[in-house]
Protein backbone atom coordinates (compact mmCIF):
# COMPACT_ATOMS: atom_id res chain seq x y z
CA UNK A 1 0.00 0.00 0.00
CA UNK A 2 2.90 2.37 0.65
CA UNK A 3 4.16 2.10 -2.92
CA UNK A 4 0.63 2.37 -4.26
CA UNK A 5 -0.05 5.63 -2.43
CA UNK A 6 3.38 7.02 -3.26
CA UNK A 7 2.42 6.68 -6.93
CA UNK A 8 -1.04 8.17 -6.29
CA UNK A 9 0.51 11.19 -4.53
CA UNK A 10 2.81 11.81 -7.49
CA UNK A 11 0.02 11.45 -10.05
CA UNK A 12 -2.30 13.76 -8.12
CA UNK A 13 0.55 16.29 -7.79
CA UNK A 14 0.41 16.53 -4.01
CA UNK A 15 3.27 18.71 -2.76
CA UNK A 16 4.75 15.96 -0.60
CA UNK A 17 7.84 16.58 1.52
CA UNK A 18 10.78 14.27 0.82
CA UNK A 19 13.52 13.02 3.10
CA UNK A 20 17.06 14.21 2.50
CA UNK A 21 20.04 12.07 1.64
CA UNK A 22 21.20 9.74 -1.11
CA UNK A 23 17.79 8.17 -1.74
CA UNK A 24 14.99 10.68 -0.95
CA UNK A 25 11.57 9.22 -0.26
CA UNK A 26 8.14 10.63 0.51
CA UNK A 27 7.53 11.34 4.19
CA UNK A 28 4.64 8.91 4.55
CA UNK A 29 3.93 6.39 7.30
CA UNK A 30 1.00 4.03 7.78
CA UNK A 31 -0.64 3.62 11.18
CA UNK A 32 -0.53 -0.18 11.30
CA UNK A 33 0.48 -2.70 8.63
CA UNK A 34 -2.45 -4.66 7.23
CA UNK A 35 -2.00 -8.43 7.25
CA UNK A 36 -1.97 -10.14 3.87
CA UNK A 37 -5.47 -11.12 2.77
CA UNK A 38 -7.29 -8.81 5.20
CA UNK A 39 -9.82 -6.37 3.76
CA UNK A 40 -10.06 -2.86 5.16
CA UNK A 41 -12.18 0.25 5.22
CA UNK A 42 -10.29 1.97 8.01
CA UNK A 43 -6.65 2.62 7.08
CA UNK A 44 -4.71 5.73 8.02
CA UNK A 45 -1.40 7.23 7.01
CA UNK A 46 0.52 10.37 7.89
CA UNK A 47 1.81 12.50 5.05
CA UNK A 48 4.10 15.50 5.42
CA UNK A 49 3.48 18.16 2.77
CA UNK A 50 5.16 21.44 1.88
CA UNK A 51 1.87 23.08 0.88
CA UNK A 52 -1.74 22.06 0.50
CA UNK A 53 -5.13 23.15 -0.73
CA UNK A 54 -8.43 22.55 1.07
CA UNK A 55 -9.43 19.08 2.24
CA UNK A 56 -12.23 19.01 -0.35
CA UNK A 57 -9.91 19.86 -3.25
CA UNK A 58 -7.21 17.43 -2.14
CA UNK A 59 -9.68 14.57 -1.75
CA UNK A 60 -10.99 15.18 -5.26
CA UNK A 61 -7.49 15.22 -6.72
CA UNK A 62 -6.31 12.12 -4.89
CA UNK A 63 -9.44 10.06 -5.53
CA UNK A 64 -9.32 10.95 -9.22
CA UNK A 65 -6.08 8.94 -9.36
CA UNK A 66 -7.19 6.04 -7.16
CA UNK A 67 -7.85 2.59 -8.55
CA UNK A 68 -11.36 1.17 -8.36
CA UNK A 69 -12.14 -0.01 -4.84
CA UNK A 70 -9.74 2.43 -3.16
CA UNK A 71 -11.06 5.73 -1.81
CA UNK A 72 -9.55 8.31 0.52
CA UNK A 73 -12.34 9.47 2.84
CA UNK A 74 -10.66 12.21 4.84
CA UNK A 75 -7.70 14.57 4.54
CA UNK A 76 -6.97 16.41 7.78
CA UNK A 77 -4.40 18.75 9.25
CA UNK A 78 -2.91 17.33 12.44
CA UNK A 79 -1.95 19.47 15.45
CA UNK A 80 1.71 20.53 15.56
CA UNK A 81 2.32 18.33 18.61
CA UNK A 82 0.62 15.24 17.16
CA UNK A 83 2.61 12.02 17.23
CA UNK A 84 2.72 9.86 14.13
CA UNK A 85 -0.16 7.44 13.70
CA UNK A 86 1.98 4.33 14.05
CA UNK A 87 3.10 5.30 17.56
CA UNK A 88 -0.38 6.14 18.91
CA UNK A 89 -2.50 3.25 17.61
CA UNK A 90 -4.01 1.42 20.59
CA UNK A 91 -6.97 -0.52 19.21
CA UNK A 92 -8.82 -1.62 16.11
CA UNK A 93 -12.23 -2.88 15.05
CA UNK A 94 -12.53 -6.00 12.92
CA UNK A 95 -15.33 -7.91 11.28
CA UNK A 96 -15.01 -11.66 10.76
CA UNK A 97 -17.43 -13.05 8.21
CA UNK A 98 -18.55 -16.46 9.44
CA UNK A 99 -21.80 -18.20 10.40
CA UNK A 100 -20.26 -21.08 12.37
CA UNK A 101 -20.86 -19.70 15.86
CA UNK A 102 -23.83 -18.84 18.08
CA UNK A 103 -24.40 -16.59 21.09
CA UNK A 104 -24.15 -19.42 23.63
CA UNK A 105 -20.71 -20.33 22.28
CA UNK A 106 -19.55 -16.72 22.48
CA UNK A 107 -20.89 -16.21 26.01
CA UNK A 108 -19.17 -19.36 27.26
CA UNK A 109 -15.92 -18.38 25.52
CA UNK A 110 -15.83 -14.91 27.07
CA UNK A 111 -16.95 -16.14 30.51
CA UNK A 112 -13.63 -17.93 30.95
CA UNK A 113 -11.31 -16.42 33.55
CA UNK A 114 -8.50 -16.53 31.02
CA UNK A 115 -8.12 -17.20 27.30
CA UNK A 116 -4.68 -18.71 26.91
CA UNK A 117 -3.11 -18.98 23.47
CA UNK A 118 0.34 -19.84 22.18
CA UNK A 119 1.71 -16.67 20.66
CA UNK A 120 4.58 -17.14 18.23
CA UNK A 121 7.21 -14.59 17.31
CA UNK A 122 10.24 -14.88 15.04
CA UNK A 123 12.45 -15.77 17.99
CA UNK A 124 10.20 -17.62 20.42
CA UNK A 125 6.74 -18.72 21.44
CA UNK A 126 4.95 -18.26 24.75
CA UNK A 127 1.55 -18.67 26.35
CA UNK A 128 -0.40 -15.42 26.63
CA UNK A 129 -3.76 -14.53 28.17
CA UNK A 130 -5.49 -12.59 25.40
CA UNK A 131 -8.75 -11.93 27.25
CA UNK A 132 -7.64 -8.46 28.52
CA UNK A 133 -6.76 -7.56 24.92
CA UNK A 134 -10.31 -8.22 23.67
CA UNK A 135 -12.10 -4.95 24.42
CA UNK A 136 -15.40 -5.92 22.82
CA UNK A 137 -16.74 -8.87 20.89
CA UNK A 138 -20.26 -9.60 19.71
CA UNK A 139 -22.22 -11.73 17.30
CA UNK A 140 -23.82 -9.92 14.35
CA UNK A 141 -26.07 -11.07 11.53
CA UNK A 142 -23.22 -11.53 9.07
CA UNK A 143 -20.41 -12.53 11.40
CA UNK A 144 -18.46 -11.50 14.48
CA UNK A 145 -17.44 -7.95 15.41
CA UNK A 146 -14.47 -7.47 17.68
CA UNK A 147 -12.49 -4.57 19.09
CA UNK A 148 -9.00 -5.61 20.10
CA UNK A 149 -5.71 -4.15 21.26
CA UNK A 150 -3.54 -3.01 18.38
CA UNK A 151 -0.24 -1.18 18.31
CA UNK A 152 3.30 -1.24 19.61
CA UNK A 153 2.39 -1.75 23.29
CA UNK A 154 -0.07 -4.64 22.81
CA UNK A 155 -1.12 -6.21 19.55
CA UNK A 156 -3.78 -8.87 19.07
CA UNK A 157 -4.57 -10.21 15.63
CA UNK A 158 -8.20 -11.20 15.00
CA UNK A 159 -7.24 -14.58 13.57
CA UNK A 160 -5.62 -15.48 16.91
CA UNK A 161 -8.93 -14.73 18.65
CA UNK A 162 -10.84 -16.82 16.12
CA UNK A 163 -8.43 -19.74 16.41
CA UNK A 164 -8.90 -19.74 20.19
CA UNK A 165 -12.68 -19.38 19.85
CA UNK A 166 -12.92 -22.21 17.32
CA UNK A 167 -10.80 -24.50 19.48
CA UNK A 168 -12.93 -23.72 22.54
CA UNK A 169 -16.22 -24.22 20.66
CA UNK A 170 -14.89 -27.35 18.91
CA UNK A 171 -15.60 -25.80 15.52
CA UNK A 172 -13.37 -26.25 12.48
CA UNK A 173 -12.69 -22.99 10.70
CA UNK A 174 -12.46 -23.18 6.90
CA UNK A 175 -9.06 -22.64 5.31
CA UNK A 176 -10.07 -19.16 4.19
CA UNK A 177 -11.98 -16.80 6.48
CA UNK A 178 -12.69 -13.19 5.48
CA UNK A 179 -11.40 -10.58 7.92
CA UNK A 180 -12.03 -6.84 7.52
CA UNK A 181 -10.49 -4.02 9.49
CA UNK A 182 -13.15 -1.39 10.15
CA UNK A 183 -11.34 1.35 12.08
CA UNK A 184 -8.33 2.15 14.25
CA UNK A 185 -8.10 4.06 17.51
CA UNK A 186 -5.74 5.96 19.77
CA UNK A 187 -6.07 6.53 23.52
CA UNK A 188 -7.21 9.88 24.87
CA UNK A 189 -7.91 10.14 28.61
CA UNK A 190 -8.16 6.33 28.76
CA UNK A 191 -10.81 6.31 26.03
CA UNK A 192 -10.44 4.88 22.54
CA UNK A 193 -10.85 7.62 19.94
CA UNK A 194 -11.00 7.00 16.20
CA UNK A 195 -7.92 8.26 14.36
CA UNK A 196 -10.36 10.01 12.03
CA UNK A 197 -11.37 12.28 14.92
CA UNK A 198 -7.83 13.63 15.28
CA UNK A 199 -7.07 16.91 13.53
CA UNK A 200 -9.43 18.99 11.43
CA UNK A 201 -10.49 19.66 7.88
CA UNK A 202 -8.65 22.31 5.89
CA UNK A 203 -11.05 24.94 4.58
Enumerate the predicted regions with their spans.
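Core RNA-modification/binding signature centered on pseudouridine synthases
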Residues: 111-203
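Ordered, amphipathic secondary-structure segments that act as subunit-interaction surfaces
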Residues: 41-96
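Helix N-cap motif at beta-to-alpha junctions
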Residues: 50-55, 100-103, 151
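Short amphipathic alpha-helices in soluble, non-transmembrane regions
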Residues: 57-66, 105-114, 161-162
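Short, charge-patterned binding micro-sites
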Residues: 17-49, 79
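Short, flexible, solvent-exposed loop/turn segments with mixed acidic/basic and small polar residues
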Residues: 34-38, 82-88, 134-140
